[in-house]
UniProtKB/Swiss-Prot annotation:
A Pfam entry, by short name: ATP-synt_ab_C
Encoding gene, per UniProt annotation: atpA
Annotated NCBIfam families: atpA, PRK13343.1
GO MF terms, alphabetically ordered: ADP binding; ATP binding; proton-transporting ATP synthase activity, rotational mechanism
Organism: Neisseria meningitidis serogroup C / serotype 2a (strain ATCC 700532 / DSM 15464 / FAM18)
Listed name of the protein: ATP synthase subunit alpha
Top-level taxon of the source organism: Bacteria
UniProt keyword Heme present: no
């Protein structure tokens, strides 16, 4: 067999054309110093802000300070094995975490790695933890309710899908309990919940997971945990990781709810990192960008319109809006809401629920101060029946508090004032609710209806809650069609009201009430 020179040159040309060279250029640097999880690196001239850096031993870090002749990076996890002179490599990637339906029902760390002992998570999708929030054009106004199942919240400070509602209060005032009730209440609604635990004891997080499992809520929940014993860097990125996992559902035309418990600890972790990076401290020793730390996180909770969902899913999902509702938690010191981080988060969110130690200790739980708790956008999202019946509740409580303050100095009260005080006491009593005993729309409407039409005027305050629970059971067994109609339509018809009036009369004359 003979090959002529032309054929040989053609073969060589073809080989050269088809040759694929996978050369990857990566910048390498050298560790100059390692202290408290902060590494200074020389030689990474083209590192990006927030880029992942690879250290020896399969450890990663984040480039945070880009200086003239060095890079300040924070190590994500253990750093004891990193020493001076080690080689550090740029990865050319921003930090990404796993996302997808496979995460639901699992407990993961801030990097999305499973920590619940249930084996690996089989998801191939990842998304960057830092994303730009949806723009004004991509959003849709909040007009669908996100029911928490708590009478005090759903009637007075309603939360809508896509809203950011702050839960603020001192330690041990029931902030986590309110958030967990909201998560448990989403069972069967199709809402995916993400609970982000930041800087908490591992035992507390295990307790939360156990409670969620007991109430069947882990089936629709992802728990992201960055415990108190973990590196400050992981506590700092945990909320962003959780938010990215929630955005996966929002961008596919679904609804998600995320709880950040709590952002005060994230701010402290970020302050620690910033001070170790030698960034200039500001008020309360926090860095200058601590407002941006929370605003860029909370702005990602939004309701996106149909066009945006269609664009994000490449036309797969049409005619559906998606939402991510955020319930950030802030812990105050001795009720000081004018501190730096609380005022920042109050100004970012669409309303706040204030929980007070005095109310909690007085047995009013959830310990919500109705006077200073507000929902700036939730009113438009409230269910019709709750909006109609709950309108007078806040007013009744406000008048009661004012009159109660004056009545301490007055010896004799006129009949009208006395009645108003009694009504206020009953309303206060009925706003109490045990943890994990959430109510659906119809059950809540029933209680509010009974308050509004004066059914509790002859019920002693001490027996009000027992009366409410007995009456609910009575209606459930005798008139289930009324509850079904209210739940289906979100409104109470005249016919339903007449049925309830007759039911109340019959219940009051029955043995159940007398007992």
């Amino acid at each position: 067999m003979q090959l002529n020179p032309a054929e040989i040159s053609d073969l060589i040309k073809a080989k050269i054309e088809n040759l694929s060279v996978n050369a990857e250029v990566r910048t390498r640097g050298t560790v100059v110093s390692v202290t408290d999880g902060i590494v200074r690196i020389h030689g990474l001239s083209d590192a990006m802000q927030g880029e992942m850096l690879e250290f020896p031993g399969n450890t990663f870090g984040l480039a945070m300070n880009l200086e003239r002749d060095s890079v300040g990076a924070v190590v994500l996890g253990e750093y004891e094995h990193i020493k001076e002179g080690d080689t550090v490599t740029c990865t050319g990637r921003i930090l990404e975490v796993p996302v997808g339906r496979e995460l639901v029902g699992r407990v993961v760390d801030a990097l999305g790695r499973p920590i619940d002992g249930k084996g690996p998570i089989n998801t191939t999708l990842t998304a960057p933890i830092e994303k730009i929030a949806p723009g004004v054009i991509a959003r849709k106004s909040v007009d669908q309710p996100m029911q928490t199942g708590l009478k005090a919240i759903d009637s007075m400070v309603p939360v809508g899908r896509g809203q950011r509602e702050l839960i603020i209060g001192d330690r041990q005032t029931g902030k986590t309990a309110v958030a967990l009730d909201a998560i448990v209440n989403q069972k069967g609604t199709g809402v995916i919940c993400i609970y982000v635990a930041i800087g908490q004891k591992a035992s507390s997080i295990a307790n939360v997971v156990r409670k969620l499992e007991e109430h069947g809520a882990m089936e629709h929940t992802i728990v992201v945990a960055a415990t108190a014993s973990e590196a400050a860097a992981l506590q700092y990125i945990a909320p962003y990781s959780g938010c990215t996992m929630g955005e996966f559902f929002r961008d596919r035309g679904e609804d998600a709810l995320i709880v950040y418990d709590d952002l005060s600890k994230q701010a402290v972790a970020y302050r620690q990192i910033s001070l170790l990076l030698r960034r200039p401290p500001g008020r309360e020793a926090y860095p200058g960008d601590v407002f941006y730390l929370h605003s860029r996180l909370l702005e990602r909770a939004a309701r996106v319109n149909e066009h945006e969902v269609e664009k994000l899913t490449n036309g797969e999902v049409k005619g559906k809006t998606g939402s991510l509702t955020a319930l950030p938690i802030i812990e105050t010191q001795a009720g000081d809401v004018s501190a730096f981080v609380p005022t920042n988060v109050i100004s970012i969110t669409d309303g706040q629920i204030f929980l007070e130690t005095d109310l909690f200790n007085a047995g009013i739980r959830p310990a919500i101060n109705a006077g200073i708790s507000v929902s700036r956008v939730g009113g438009a999202a409230q269910t019709k029946v709750i909006k109609k019946l709950g309108g007078g509740i806040r007013l009744a409580l406000a008048q009661y508090r004012e009159l109660a303050a004056f009545s301490q100095f007055a010896s004799d009260l006129d009949e009208a004032t006395r009645k108003q005080l009694e009504h206020g006491e009953v309303v206060t009593e009925l706003m109490k609710q045990k943890q994990f005993s959430t109510l659906n729309t119809a059950e809540m409407a029933l209680t509010l209806w009974a308050i509004n039409n004066g059914s509790y005027s002859d019920v002693p305050v001490a027996k009000a809650l027992a009366f409410e629970s007995e009456f609910l059971s009575f209606v459930r067994t005798q008139h289930p069609e009324v509850l079904e109609a209210v739940n289906a339509s979100g409104a109470m018809s005249d016919e339903s009201e007449k049925t309830l009036e007759a039911a109340m009369k019959s219940f009051k004359s029955s043995y159940a009430y007398q007992a």
